[in-house]
Curated annotation (Swiss-Prot):
The lineage of its organism: Eukaryota, Metazoa, Ecdysozoa, Arthropoda, Hexapoda. Involved in and required for double-strand break repair by meiotic and mitotic homologous recombination. During meiosis, has a dual role in the repair of meiotic double-stranded breaks and the efficient activation of the meiotic recombination checkpoint. Its main location: nucleus. The gene is Brca2. Interacts with Rad9 and spn-A/Rad51. This is Breast cancer type 2 susceptibility protein homolog. Keywords: Cell cycle, Cell division, DNA damage, DNA repair, Meiosis, Mitosis, Nucleus, Repeat. GO terms for biological process: cell division; DNA synthesis involved in double-strand break repair via homologous recombination; meiotic DNA repair synthesis involved in reciprocal meiotic recombination; meiotic recombination checkpoint signaling; regulation of DNA-templated transcription; response to camptothecin. It is found in: Nucleus. The keyword Calcium does not apply. Residues 325-348, 415-431, 904-921 have a biased composition (Basic and acidic residues).
Amino acid sequence: MDQNGASGSRPNRLSQGKEAYACERSATVSAAADRSNIINEMAKICEADRQTSAIARRTQVHERLAVANSDFVAVEDLILAYAEPTPEDQVEMIMRDFCSSPTYEEDEDEPSYESEPWFRFRNKRIRTYSRKRDPKSYMAVRTEKSSGTSGLSVQRDLNTSSTSVACDFDAASSQKIHEVLLNLSQYFSATAKASSPTPVPSQIDLPTEARQDSGDECFNAEVENLRDDLLQNGFTFEASIYDNEHEQEDSGKFNVCSDADSTPKKTDVEIAEHKKHLKGPTQAEHVGKEENTNFILEGIPLSEWLTPMEPPKISKDVIKNIPDKKVKLEPSSQKEQKSSKDSNESKIRAASCDITKKNEGTTVLDQPNAAQQENLSNDGDLLEEFLFNEWHPMQCSNGPSTSNDAIKVPKEEINSIKRNDEEQPEKETPNKSRSTSSHQLSFRKTFLKFIEISGEMKIKGEKFVEKVVSGLHHPSHKCNLRTEEYSDNHSQVMESTQRVEFKSALSKPIELLDEKETYDMLAKVEVGEINGKCSPLNNETIAEPEFCGFRTASNKAIPISEKMKIKTAEFMAEFQSKETNHQNDYLVNQPNDNSTSVGRDTAFKKSIEISEEMPTKASKLVVVDTTLGEPHQPKIDPVCSDLNESQFFGFRTASNKAIEITEAMEKRGAMFLAQSRATDQQAEWQPSDFPDIPHTSPKNEIHSINVENTKAVHTKTASETEFFGFRTASNKGIVISENTKKKVAQFMSEFQAADASTDSNKPIVISEESRNIAAKFVDEAATEDSPNKPTFCNVQSQENPLDIEHFKHDLFVERSAKEEHPLCSQPLVRTPRRSQEIHSSLSQLAGQSPLDQATKKSVIARRNLLSLKRKRKIVSSTETSTSCASPAMERFAPKPSSTSTPLADRDLNRSKDCAKNRQDAEDMSPICMQPKKSRRLGLSRSRY
């Protein structure tokens, strides 16, 4: 059954596949037919378009043959006339704009793989203004890279330009540079053998001529520069420096001293002379090499050496030889000067420098020959050019020694030097005539600048040295010589006619009034200094006379001229007169029972103790008349009495000009003094605002004070209660008009208890008598300070004594009533009580404002408008009007000041002062008062 099922299913599958294939074939055929149909349709459309365009062209050609009789232009004509440019035209325009500059370069070769259109700047390159690179530099880098096979570890950056690129060398110079680098590499490889345990083998193929000591390459350039500097400064070379004539040891170590140390090239004559002194085959070989020496490093500065170099460490055992020749440096101007006599120090140094052998820690001096004697004389000449303090200890050896052992010199050599020195005669001081034959000692400002020394200076120097030497052994003789010399100088100064001059800081001569006194003073000062230095009593204290003058910070006495004494006398006289006036005032103000001591006080009112020496010192400077009768005319010192000028005692301006004092000024001064004393006493005895009469004087006695006037002003009695006027800050009287007098009279009448009327509504009637009294009182109080008007001391006039007494009696009655009834002592006429809705600041404005009446009324009207025209509630009753216990304040009582729009003094943090709980309008100003939200009828609105 399975086979039958399988056989039955197979044809079914084939039939299904055939059907599917037929469907797909039909679909492809239909799709191809559709495509062919679309192509045919498109071809038909294109053909139709072609035919229509051809027809249009034919018709257009026919129409153009006709004459245009209208301004009509077809669209096709516009399109043909204004056709867009092709991209090639645009590229040409851009090329003309951007590529016309000479710095523009274009590559002709174009890649073939690019297709049009390509970017128009594909092969375009615009050059900047930089340095043009040399095409040869690439070749130089390649050659360096290929030839750099040496053992030097020089790292180069191929991206940066090397030195060979920066400067073009020829073949010879580049070859020299390479040889130098190879020599340096050999030097470092040779020095590394001793330090490193495993030396690296050298792979450098060096030329035969380059195998020389390392000192030639290390020091040649430095020596050349030193030679040029010395030749420019005027120095010459007579011999070469230490030559490199030592043997090279088997250990491979090198010495620092070499042939390169010699500054100039050796001539043939020098080489021939040098060969005579050589001993050994190695030295001859070095001389032969020296002739063919090539200065490889000549012309290359040290700054271009990239590798730092350090000389190798050399032990003292290797160096055993020292050259015979020495070098001598001296200025060319003194080249021919030679001396046959040397000093002891120069011989010792020359002997110590001639050490040639060192055996078992001791040194032996060679026997001096002719060449060494010549060297000794040359060294003596060289050492004479330097000062003694510029000499430095030196040790001459075959090379740089690190030991600090002293060099032993045999005693026989030193004794022979001393004997030769004793046999030689003493040196004489060189003069200008002998300057050509011997070296002269000189002083130098800098290394090459010398100070010229004249013959007089040399003679003075010799005398000074002799005095110093003699003074070291005989100090008493030295002191006597100095005293004799100073006395001779003093006699020469007194006898000579030469003028002694003093110069200021700007080198200007100062004129001397008395030249003789100046000579005497200088001689005394010099003799005093000599006596002070030479006297045996220097250690003992000598009592100097006490100086009672003034001294500077350096303890120099200040001379006091006659003008200074006169000014001091004037000042002391004025000071004494002021002091006596203050003492008199103090005595007047003090009670008679207590006795006061007159003296000087400090700023803290502490008495100054005056000793007995202080008056004597003061009397030596200034003599002051202490009499009180004429304090402005002091007695001047008799020294100043012979002056013809009249002395001025007064006031002066800032430019020291005298101020003339007129009679009016004197009167005003007297008035001011009397007023100040009266006010002081009034403030001390009765410190009340108004003049009071003491309770202990029932008869109204008037106390008076005697005032002294120094300028013919008679003393007058002034009472305590005289002055009632007004003055400015400069103590000038204020003129009071009639209107002001009436107001003052009205003001004063309010304080008088005329009638004991209890009716508060009854108007007050001011009598004519009280008005006259007040007016006269004000007239007298407001008088100006002029010589035509009487002074305030005479306020108690003789015309109206009864009026003044009556006024004082009224004041006394009023004050006695206040003391008996303190509660009823308020004035009867008061302002109405303040309303509970008006702030105190507005009441202050009404009472204390300096405005006139009209302005006050306008301000009050404005206040009423802002407060909604609330009327003031006058709370009054018979009890408050009749009784004296009214809590209201007086009209003119002092009140606290406030701002224009004050607020109530409240604390917002407290609950009772919060705005929610506050409902009274008196807590705020009427300007800032909140409106009351009450129910209103009709169309009325709130003003806020």
